Amino acid sequence: VTGVQTCALPISRDAVPLTAEWAVKVREAIGSGPTLGIDWHHRLSIPETVSFVNRMPRGTLDYLEEPIRAESPAAYAQLRTLIDVPLAIGEEFSSKWAFAPFIEQGLTDLVRVDVCNVGGLTEAMKVAAMAESRYLDLMPHHPLGPICGAATAHLCLAAPNVSAMEIRRSPTEDLGFYDERLFPVQPRQEGPRLFV
């Protein structure tokens, strides 16, 4: 597999078996090397999440991102006892305080900090330090344009516990942020600062 390819999946709950089948086929096609995760974006219940995971052989997914709403650490604690797939949580959290129970209680494996949502690089670095103290990696969320991308890249270079940075430049998701006709001045690195 060269590059990243995306696939739009149905968003109804009937998609659980279809998505599990698709994930198994993708894993078979790409082998065990590349990381494979599914982001349900809070669309499932706890029983649906368990059903989804149980439809796949162990090791199909490297992580499962936010299958249920993240307002309730207790719900994630329950889910944690029912599945063995690593969880990625936090892309919508707006402060270190929202991350604290998920990190302190071991409810997430990959911390999905979003520099823009969490309030900037200083707060993101505090989340990174909290995660590092529990031997957790960051997988920063980056859904926005080039300025957010540059800030997220700075976070990834500054934090010692980053596993991957999300970059969304696929044809199905490109919102025009990188179109040089619309944004002729693109972010670039010039020394140790963010320059746009």
Where are these regions (language model features)?
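Shared catalytic-loop signature of beta/alpha-barrel
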Residues: 54, 60-63, 71-195
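Glycine-centered, small-residue-biased loops immediately flanking beta-strands
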Residues: 34
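Glycine/Thr-rich beta-alpha phosphate-binding loop at enzyme active sites
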Residues: 10-14, 61-67
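Short, small-residue-biased leader/transition segments that mark boundaries at the very start
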Residues: 2-9
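Distinct, well-ordered alpha-helical segments
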Residues: 14-28, 44-57, 75-80, 98-104
